[in-house]
Curated annotation (Swiss-Prot):
Activity regulation, free text: Inhibited by borate, fluoride, L-Asn and L-Asp, but not by phenylphosphorodiamidate.
Free-text comment on the cofactor: Binds 2 manganese ions per subunit.
Region described as Disordered: 56-78
One annotated Gene Ontology cellular component of this protein: endoplasmic reticulum
Assembly information from the UniProt record: Homodimer.
Keywords for this protein: Endoplasmic reticulum, Glycoprotein, Hydrolase, Manganese, Metal-binding, Purine metabolism, Signal
Compositional bias of kind Low complexity: 56-75
Tissues of expression: Expressed in seedlings, roots, stems, leaves, flowers, siliques and seeds.
Cofactor entry: Mn(2+)
Segment forming the signal sequence: 1-53
Protein name: Allantoate deiminase
Function: Involved in the catabolism of purine nucleotides. Can use allantoate as substrate, but not Nalpha-carbamoyl-L-Asp, Nalpha-carbamoyl-L-Ala or Nalpha-carbamoyl-Gly. The sequential activity of AAH, UGLYAH and UAH allows a complete purine breakdown without the intermediate generation of urea. Involved in the regulation of seed maturation and seed dormancy.
Organism from which the protein derives: Arabidopsis thaliana
């Protein structure tokens, strides 16, 4: 188990009266005055049957306005479930949305959202998240990597814990849902169980984790938080430095977290103590919006390869070298990039597989392969000079590792052939390789059932099958898969936009995510 860090205790909002009536969330943060409507709900819930009868009699002679107000607060026979539904919705949707907005204001920049590993904003976010965890009845601590934990132990049951998490760091000029939604929806679901007096009914410990670093912006090293808990972070990673020459270890020590080689190793969770890991995350793509569904289950996270391609030719004067005599690396690079696009759009037309590459691999590539050239540079980069060298990057992702390796082999062969034909020198350097991570089938089925049940409760109708899709983006689940089985739930985002201030999730979809996690937790009782 991770060693708690002795940080100062955070202030707690009231566990029940913290913004549970939806109209209050449009104008206030979570720490403002509680709804008077809920106050009267509590008063009436404690009244005797005689008082309830008197209230009912009084309401019959009240004005239309009073009658409308009374319909929100009455807890008479037959109305308890409706009131509970409103309360749950207020926590899972309205309060969660308010908290997303509040956390989205915790930034290192005045003009945009920026919260990187161990920055001042990330330190300010820690007590805020801890306070929300404590509000949900969780015991909290901060570990030696700056991860924030909130845990509840069952009265009886298994010692193997269910971990639910996502990251609290952001990219530069970020949206407020990436990472934060997964943390807040889990906290909200557990708060509902606390309000209902059911936390103790869980059959295993549940631990919510807000990982300190997933994006890797500051140190160009992703998954610092989750990799430490999964036991896959090398000690040497502590010495990696940012642009200012500050190391990971220094950044932690500057914030009174005394990380050492020894206690980094102590952060690793014992696999026998963990039942599984679940992560809620915005899709960061357009599929759910396109199919018109708020939630989807992730079947796996794509494997990824990053290449650096360098093409060298003959540098010369733009006006004096005839076209037929040029060895132009720019036009050569352009042909390579067009080849990449063709291969990734129609992999079966280019793939020359060995016996390992079967029909399933070809189909998987056709459905999941994506390729991107994200950077390109020339030397000497002058308008009147034929370049001497062009360098570009390739990001290639697919759910099928066998297919990814086969495509890379065939792509490289064809690239070298094009360079030879053009009398150019070509080098292909592999900069990063990560295998795909598959979600646990049984855990995915449970999440799918929970999502289906949540959406049925929200709409009152039986919904179509919950979509199952691949994640092209990396997530903390990739690191946690080295520790335990993993499952992920995607939430629809507008236009598929992420890593942008235009990133947006509908309030009802925020509520759907929280309700799905609540349904999943109830299946763990």
């Amino acid at each position: 188990m991770a060693v708690p860090h002795p940080s100062s205790s955070s202030s707690r909002s009231h566990p029940f009266l913290s913004h549970v009536y939806h109209t209050s969330f449009h104008h206030h943060h979570h720490h403002n005055h509680p709804s008077l409507v809920l106050f009267w709900c509590l008063v009436f819930s404690l009244l005797s049957p005689l008082a309830l009868s008197s209230s009912s009699s009084s309401s019959s002679s009240s004005s239309d306005s009073s009658s409308s107000s009374s319909s929100h607060i009455s807890l008479g026979i037959g109305e308890t479930e409706g009131t509970k539904h409103d309360l749950h919705q207020a926590i899972l949707r309205d309060e969660a949305v308010a908290r997303l907005h509040e956390l989205g204001q915790v930034s290192d920049a005045a003009t945009h959202l920026e919260r990187t590993f161990m920055s001042p904003a990330s330190i300010r976010a820690i007590p805020l998240i801890r306070g929300w965890m404590e509000d949900a009845g969780l015991s909290t601590w901060v570990d030696y990597m700056g991860n924030v934990h909130g845990r509840v132990e069952p009265k009886n049951g298994s010692s193997q814990a269910l971990l639910i998490g996502s990251h609290m760091d952001t990219v530069i000029d970020a949206g407020k849902y990436d990472g934060s939604l997964g943390i807040i929806s889990a906290i909200s679901a557990l708060k509902v169980l606390k309000i209902d007096g059911r936390l103790g009914e869980l059959k295993r410990p549940v631990e919510v984790i807000a990982f300190s670093d997933e994006e890797g912006v500051r140190f160009q090293s992703t998954f610092l938080g989750s990799a430490a808990l999964a036991g896959i972070m090398p000690v040497s990673r502590l010495e990696v430095t940012d642009k200012s020459g500050i190391s990971v270890q220094d950044a932690l020590k500057e914030n009174s977290i005394d990380i050492t080689d020894e206690n980094l190793m102590q952060l690793k969770y014992d696999p026998a103590s963990v039942w599984g890991y679940v992560e809620v995350h915005i899709e960061q793509g357009p599929v759910l919006e396109w199919v018109g569904y708020p939630l989807g289950v992730v079947k796996g996270i794509a494997g990824q390869t990053r290449l650096k391609v360098t093409v060298k030719g003959s540098q010369g004067h733009a006006g004096t070298v005839p076209m037929s005599m040029r060895q132009d690396p720019m036009t050569g690079a352009a042909e390579l990039i067009v080849l990449l696009e063709s291969v990734c759009k129609n992999p079966k037309d280019y793939l020359s597989c060995n016996v390992q590459c079967n029909e399933d691999t070809v189909e998987s590539l056709a459905n999941s392969l994506v390729c991107t050239v994200g950077e390109i540079s020339t030397w000497p980069s002058a308008s009147n000079v034929i370049p001497g060298q062009v360098t570009f990057t390739v990001d290639l992702r697919t759910i099928d590792d066998v297919g990814r390796k086969a495509i890379l082999h065939d792509l490289s062969t064809r690239m070298y052939q094009i360079c030879d034909k053009r009398s150019l020198l070509c080098s292909i350097e592999r900069k990063h390789d990560a295998d795909a991570v598959m979600s646990d089938p049984q855990l995915s089925l449970q999440l799918k059932s929970a999502a289906q049940s949540a959406l049925k409760k929200m709409t009152g109708e039986v919904q179509d099958e919950v979509p199952v899709l691949m994640s092209g983006a990396g997530h903390d689940a990739m690191a946690m898969a080295h520790l335990t089985k993993v499952g992920m739930l995607f939430v629809r985002c507008r236009g598929g936009i992420s890593h942008s201030p235009a990133e947006h999730v509908l309030d009802d979809d925020v509520g759907a995510a929280g309700l799905a996690i609540l349904e999943f937790l109830e299946s763990q009782m």
